[in-house]
Amino acid sequence: MAVVIDGKAKAASVTEAVRKSAEALEAEKGVKPGLAVVIVGNDPASHAYVNSKSKMAKQCGFNSIQHTLPEETTQAALLKLVGELNTDASIHGILVQLPLPKHFNSDEIIQSILPEKDVDGLSVLNAGKLATGDLATGLISCTPAGAMLLVRGIHGDDLSGLNAVVIGRSNLFGKPMGQLLLNANATVTMAHSRTKDLVTVCKTADILVAAVGRAAMVKGDWVKPGATVIDVGINRIAAPEKGEGKSKLVGDVAFDEASAVAAAITPVPGGVGPMTIAMLMANTVIAAHRALGKTAPKF
């Protein structure tokens, strides 16, 4: 049976380190790290995410500001708000909760955030720094950064000689995850919906990362014996065993099957998810240090 990787415990240790770092910064400079979270519309899942981010920011001792805008907000109005946050020296991190309502050009909004305040790591500049191997001066997308910390907890910092397969090529996760693994010297294969003979590709992986958004797609026989499996999927499915109309969260990996074969595996929930918010806090305290001319902490 695989070791179940405890994302909650790792996230708690990261947020405690962030809290101490924020405390020391405030003691020295008299400045709290400032995080502004912007949400548009009424999507309940987005509101739940934003509330947990704002709550965690307060626990870390940040100046946490939430802007909740109505569904009918215009592109121009949102761009104006981002512009104001860009020039506000008390705000070190800006996060616009995605997905935005359909009438928005999300990319224009995201790219309008100053790269040094882009704590989601989605600006072209931050993505480019990661792609060129600069892990020191940019901000790295939170979910891959968190997943990578879990990988390093199992394998250490140097992944030389290990094969890694990432299923999923999104800008939000797949591409930056591939870059992080590559920067740690893994041999990386990027797989996706058009990959030929996906099962065979996956079976080569010492580190298998699934981020496709399809419940239990990765079966036990896709997993190389002794592999580390990182499950980034969050899928809500019906759970009649819990009662009529009930649902549960599952990942992209068939957990019971895969955990019989793998050496280590992340659960859903409680694996990569908690790491995402922890790394958002880490990025915010890093951005605050840089803004104040201080050497940023490492996590």
Swiss-Prot record:
One GO cellular component term: cytosol
Pathway(s) of this molecule: One-carbon metabolism; tetrahydrofolate interconversion
CDD domains, A to Z: NAD_bind_m-THF_DH_Cyclohyd (cd01080)
Catalytic activity of the protein: (6R)-5,10-methylene-5,6,7,8-tetrahydrofolate + NADP(+) = (6R)-5,10-methenyltetrahydrofolate + NADPH; (6R)-5,10-methenyltetrahydrofolate + H2O = (6R)-10-formyltetrahydrofolate + H(+)
Regions annotated as coiled coil: none
Keywords: Amino-acid biosynthesis, Histidine biosynthesis, Hydrolase, Methionine biosynthesis, Multifunctional enzyme, NADP, One-carbon metabolism, Oxidoreductase, Purine biosynthesis
Gene Ontology MF: a single term: methenyltetrahydrofolate cyclohydrolase activity
A Gene Ontology biological process term: purine nucleotide biosynthetic process
The protein's Enzyme Commission number: 1.5.1.5, 3.5.4.9
Name of protein: Bifunctional protein FolD
Taxonomic lineage: Bacteria, Pseudomonadati, Pseudomonadota, Alphaproteobacteria, Hyphomicrobiales
